[in-house]
Regions:
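N-terminal Rossmann-like NAD(P)+-binding domain of SDR-like oxidoreductases, especially those catalyzing
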Residues: 1-200
Length: 201
């Protein structure tokens, strides 16, 4: 059995590769080796890994990487705090759509796709204000962060308290989180529609 790991040179990807090798899988890694994170193939990557240098946004690289694999761990992602809004969509959403597009187009017999989401896709979570009212806070204010105020506050500036919550709808507050929830939706819905077993974690 062969596994493709996109973003496999990163921290989570490389540890996933190590575990899969230990379990007896063949591992192929697709990674763009983006600077400043990587300057070359990291020394910590096991020599048994088949490495393809390329981006998850490149249809040719993805097409090559998908050939002959049974499982896909799609871990490649873009995360930054700079306003590269379209890049979040290109890397985190469009690359996921491309993977499904190629699998459907080429009728590849993929047994399962595992997509890495993020806690950022959930948003800040549910809070209670001082009167016990539920509050879904917006983004932390930059002026508060500059003052060293990192806790979320109510609209009136009052204190908020983290609430125990039942399952709730996601409420991401930054471009990274928005792109990761969109990625989850693409993966789960395309997987369901085209009968490609898919998990978003």
């Amino acid at each position: 059995m062969k596994v493709l790991i996109t973003g496999g040179a990163g921290f989570i990807g490389s540890h996933t590769a190590d575990r899969l090798l230990k379990e007896g899988y063949e591992v192929r890694v697709l990674d763009s080796l983006q600077k400043p994170i990587h300057n070359s193939i990291p020394e910590y990557l096991d020599d048994r890994i088949e490495f393809i240098a390329g981006s998850a946004t490149d249809i040719r690289a993805i097409t090559e990487a998908l050939q002959g694999v049974d499982y896909v761990y799609h871990l490649a992602a873009f995360q930054d705090y700079l306003p590269y809004f379209s890049r979040f969509v290109d890397v985190n959403v469009a690359s996921t759509a491309r993977i499904y597009e190629i699998i459907v187009r080429d009728k590849l017999p993929i047994k399962k796709i595992i997509v890495a989401s993020s806690q950022a896709a959930l948003g800040e979570g549910l809070y209670l204000d001082s009167r016990g009212n539920e509050v879904l806070p917006d983004t932390r204010l930059e002026e508060n962060l500059k003052k060293g105020i990192f806790d979320l506050t109510a609209e009136d500036g009052g204190e908020l308290f983290l609430a125990k919550t039942p399952e709730r709808i996601s409420n991401p507050q930054n471009p990274y989180g928005m792109s990761k929830i969109a990625e989850e939706m693409f993966a789960l819905q395309l997987g369901k529609r085209y009968k490609i077993p898919t998990v978003a974690m």
